[in-house]
């Protein structure tokens, strides 16, 4: 499965539908995580349909929030800073292969996706994430390296 190709196709379609800027897409082993905020349920559903249209997609997790109020630049900056702090702490932690994870934060909610080498590593990643200032919740879509779910 070519995750990069899936990502490019989904982003291209989202751009064509005018919803690219408000949605973040992460892909891991054909599993797609959609996050962000849109102003209508129709746009949320459209993004999910776009993801499912890609032939190699195995699963779509739609965490897109519907909110009529536009997200401010300050809120985006705070969320980006949270993700950056988590990534930096993961890189500094000897027991974590940080390259195997993607992190996205929306409204203080941290979404983790990727492959953990072990339950211990995953617990460390979740713990690091929870300790960053501004984090309200951590939602993990991480799979363990040897999980039967990966096959």
UniProtKB/Swiss-Prot annotation:
Matching InterPro entries: BON_dom, Lipoprotein_DolP, Transpt-assoc_nodulatn_dom_bac
Domain BON: 2-68, 78-146
Pfam family, one: BON
Gene3D superfamilies in the record: 3.30.1340.30
Keywords tagged on the record: Repeat
Coiled coil: none
Protein name stated in the entry: Uncharacterized protein in gshII 5'region
Species of origin: Anaplasma centrale
């Amino acid at each position: 499965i070519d995750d990069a190709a899936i990502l490019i196709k989904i982003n291209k379609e989202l751009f064509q539908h005018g919803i690219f800027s408000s949605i973040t897409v992460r892909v891991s082993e054909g599993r797609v995580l959609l996050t962000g905020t849109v102003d209508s349920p129709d746009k949320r559903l459209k993004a999910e349909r776009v993801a499912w249209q890609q032939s190699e997609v195995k699963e779509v997790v739609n965490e897109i929030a519907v909110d009529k109020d536009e997200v401010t630049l300050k809120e985006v900056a705070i969320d980006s800073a949270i993700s950056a702090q988590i990534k930096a702490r993961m890189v500094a932690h000897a027991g974590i292969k940080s390259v195997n994870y993607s992190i996205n934060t929306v409204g203080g909610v941290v979404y983790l996706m990727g492959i953990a080498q072990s339950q211990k590593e995953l617990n460390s990643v979740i713990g690091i994430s929870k300790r960053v200032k501004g984090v309200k919740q951590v939602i993990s879509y991480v799979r363990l390296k040897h999980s039967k779910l990966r096959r």
